[in-house]
Design a protein with these regions (language model features):
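Short, conserved micro-motifs composed of acidic
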Residues: 19, 29, 33-35, 39-307
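Residues that mark the junctions of alpha-helical repeat units in TPR/alpha-solenoid scaffolds
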Residues: 15-16
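Structural marker of alpha-solenoid helical repeat scaffolds
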Residues: 10-12, 46
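Canonical positions in the second alpha-helix
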Residues: 6-8, 43
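Alpha-helical solenoid repeat scaffolds, predominantly canonical TPR units
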Residues: 3-4, 39
Length: 307
């Protein structure tokens, strides 16, 4: 919010469209909905004409409805949280949870990620405390999985013998594209005799774009993920591939404009009836909000061949 406010103070209506959109969303995030509405109207006037104006009016009605909703959930801070980032929890084996954390558990001088000055993310596992429904005894996940760069966003097969997760494009060294960007990739590991094997990247990865945030359908036959690959509608879209009998994958399919916007869709999660995801492109309260859609309403675009 602070830096977007400085930009707007300096440039006002000449502020770039992308920055104007993000500034409006940051205002939502701090509860300044009145000013956010005004800036979103300015954003839409600059972006297009009457059709967008009608959409803006509809969005305001939806937002007003959200603000009038009664709270339905109690939110508790778990004991495994630290002063660093913790996110992307996933149940594992019935009584454990695997999650990503930048928690510094080393006695040595830990390498830090320059973007946020926090240690690199690793996967941790914690046990469920049946009495309190909290989590305890958090430990780092397998040494075969965690590296000196980022690992996060894990998904497990129904039998817990296969896992997918997000990692920097890192083999023996950090790989970059032609513009010098190190992308994210999805990796897969299988468990043999109770031990996780060295992970291998999935076939639809590329050195030229990112894939991440894997999520498996309950039967393990579809893998949903996030990417900015060619054919994306926005900054990051949600895609799906079929997991075939031999372990290979179909070509990625975009979930389409009912789900994906020109902005960011991220962190998909699937149960038997609904897809849940985060977005800053749909109408919400600011930043990334959580949305849901019933499977019956999904209209998935044709396959995209990235070979």
């Amino acid at each position: 919010y602070k830096w977007y406010n400085i930009l707007y103070t300096k440039y006002e209506s000449d502020m770039g469209l992308d920055y104007l959109f993000k500034y409006a969303h940051s205002l939502k995030g701090i509860g300044n909905y009145k000013r956010s509405k005004r800036l979103l109207k300015l954003y839409n006037r600059k972006l297009a004409g009457e059709e967008v104006e009608q959409q803006t009016k509809h969005n305001e009605i939806v937002l007003d409805g959200l603000l009038r909703m009664e709270e339905k959930f109690d939110i508790n801070n778990l004991s495994i949280n630290s002063k660093y980032s913790e996110f992307s929890p996933m149940y594992y084996g019935g009584d454990q949870m695997v999650y990503a954390s930048a928690k510094d558990s080393s006695i040595f001088n830990t390498r830090r990620y320059k973007w946020n000055n926090q240690p690199y993310l690793d996967l941790f596992v914690a046990k469920v405390n049946d009495e309190t429904q909290d989590f305890k005894n958090a430990l780092k996940f397998s040494k075969k999985i965690n590296t000196k760069y980022h690992e996060a966003s894990v998904a497990f097969s129904p039998d817990n013998e296969t896992m997918y997760f997000t990692r920097n494009n890192y083999g023996k060294k950090l790989k970059r594209d032609k513009n010098g960007i190190n992308h994210l990739k999805i990796y897969r590991s299988r468990k043999v005799n109770g031990e996780w094997l060295e992970a291998e990247e999935v076939s639809f990865n590329s050195d030229e774009y990112s894939t991440g945030h894997p999520a498996l359908s309950p039967d393990g036959k579809q893998l949903y993920f996030v990417s900015d690959m060619p054919g994306s509608i926005g900054e990051t879209d949600i895609f799906v591939v079929d997991v075939l009998e031999d372990g290979s994958f179909s070509s990625p399919r975009n979930l389409g404009p009912e789900i994906n916007t020109e902005h960011k869709e991220m962190f998909p999660f699937i149960n038997d009836k609904k897809l849940y995801f985060s977005s800053d492109g749909h109408v919400g309260l600011g930043g990334l909000d959580v949305f849901e859609v019933a499977f019956d309403n999904l209209k998935i675009k044709k396959e995209f061949n990235n070979s």
